């Protein structure tokens, strides 16, 4: 869609009191700006007659044309904005530092490549992470991350308005904690604060990212863009380039070959057919994952009639008073997913009463209580052990001390939303980190903030 922005042209017509003509009669907008000639206000809104307002001031108001600007015409400014978005939390990475060494020339080069439609994404970097679950990640070069943020800034606002309220991944103000809170809200709503019986159906899509058909995804994205008038050539070009990129082409593998041992085929992009799978690690992949399943969200809410529904990426749930209605929904949802090349995970179909313990997004929810899952507490324990091994009993520098303090505070801030006091406090009390830090309880935090001891700074 063409955006309205102020682009100043020569004054529209004669400004000395005569008629002002808009010859093209094209319905452009107009803007009044100060002009140093002794003249009057001349206004023209698609007519041949000037609307004159005599003015005794030396500086009259001259009406100038304001024209719709295309994305190409604001591209350089948009690229600088995208760069600053992309570098958040990435200031110390090698690819970001390399890009910043010649920042202006790199952005201008990228600008010309995009204007001439000659931009080609760089090869991705592939590696395996094992953060509770083994995953294959494809990381893009920082240059491509800038383009991803550029595309995000252009289209995310449109798709955000189309998503259902209860989808939580990669949306502002709708992270994991919001997803947990909304699950509890829906349970209390259906059960009338646990005074009535209700059931929850939990489902999971098997190997979601690795089974997304890029051709189907592009059809969905382009259909929405055209429907709402987002037909700028640059925007359509970026859609093609980003979705059509083959992450496996000339990618660089990092790590040991043994890192891929035990990785299921459903989580490995190289085991998928050509044109299938999105790279985990790109910002655009998070956006596309929400777009791809938006039709599923609407199918469940509006066609199957489930008001109490929520989804985080490929993990979703439905709540209803009728157990039979939920059982019937399994086959209908499975059929819908088959039409877009997806399948339900056969081992992750769970239908049980809302009074049972419900695991979702690292939390275990039960009536009137919210606990952390074993996986979440184990991650905190592992992180604590890692920091202890780095600290040992030796003196640590200010930079490391600040990083450790920030990491612990982040975990404590998150765990403060759960009933995990005894476990967390025991781990902290027994930790050798207390030789470098002290815990100061604040009035608005369950565990307080970790602060440096004064004597540890000597």
For every predicted segment, state its role.
Residues 70-226, 230-235, 247-250, 457-458:
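Conserved two-metal-ion catalytic palm core of "right-hand" nucleic acid polymerases
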Residues 334-342:
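A common structural junction motif
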